[in-house]
């Protein structure tokens, strides 16, 4: 675990306890134009459907840089996108981990925000953090400013325990969301989310959404910026994920 500077924890490979919530989210159309989310949702909620014989899910977290104030007149880009593309970097970390595990045999399959894996469910189960009202995984040290990578394995590993939810009665993310996209129960209506419209959506942005975008160019980050757990700088951020002035 010392190889992974932000966090490395293990969850049991179990069916998602939030499977029914996912199905309801899809039925409500809250996935907007992300049609891949609606493909084989049952497979997405069960690691054994992705990797037969899966017994454990290893979750890696990797911090990205702290929020910085920017003049309102400047176009804003979400915090995580200021550094290098995290996919390739975390895939290298997964490859290192797979090489270590190969000593013990078994089969492994890794994903970085790209496969039919409910990584936030696994991250919550193993105590990487708790699920905030915004749907993001939040930690007491570092808030929600981190990427998640998952490695499914057929090896039986000792699981870590979940942590207590630290949101309490706070609803800042939901109350200050510029479009009311945060439902406050850990779910987001992507059809209202500015990150969806400025990152995931392909095509023209609806006229009723355009005035709400303001100076945002890519992403939103309001829910990240207003979260009390994100107030302190992160001391040990990989230089590749440091913010730079574009």
PLM regions with names:
Residues 158, 199-200:
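A short, flexible beta-alpha/helix-coil linker loop
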Residues 1-166, 205, 214-215:
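Auxiliary alpha/beta "docking" domains used to position bulky ligands
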Residues 245-246:
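Glycine-rich phosphate/pyrophosphate-binding loop
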């Amino acid at each position: 675990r010392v190889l992974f500077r932000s966090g490395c924890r293990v969850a049991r490979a179990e069916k998602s306890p939030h499977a029914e919530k996912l199905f309801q989210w899809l039925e409500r159309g809250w996935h907007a134009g992300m049609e891949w989310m609606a493909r084989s949702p049952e497979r997405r909620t069960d690691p054994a459907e992705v990797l037969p014989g899966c017994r454990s899910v290893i979750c890696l977290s990797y911090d990205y840089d702290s929020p910085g104030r920017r003049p309102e007149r400047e176009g804003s880009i979400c915090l995580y996108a200021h550094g290098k593309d995290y996919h390739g970097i975390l895939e290298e970390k997964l490859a290192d981990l797979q090489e270590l595990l190969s000593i013990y045999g078994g089969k492994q399959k890794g994903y970085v925000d790209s496969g039919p894996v409910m990584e936030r469910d696994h991250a919550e189960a193993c105590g990487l953090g708790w699920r905030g009202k915004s749907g993001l995984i939040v930690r007491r040290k570092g808030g929600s400013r981190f990427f998640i990578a998952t490695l499914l394995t057929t090896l039986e590993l000792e699981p870590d325990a979940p942590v207590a939810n630290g949101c309490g009665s706070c609803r800042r993310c939901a109350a200050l969301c510029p479009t009311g996209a945060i439902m406050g129960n850990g779910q987001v209506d992507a059809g209202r989310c500015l990150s969806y419209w400025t990152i995931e959506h392909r095509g023209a942005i609806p006229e009723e959404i355009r005035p709400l975008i303001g100076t945002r160019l890519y992403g939103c980050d309001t829910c990240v910026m207003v979260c009390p757990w994100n107030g302190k700088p992160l001391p040990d951020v990989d230089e590749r994920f440091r913010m730079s002035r574009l």
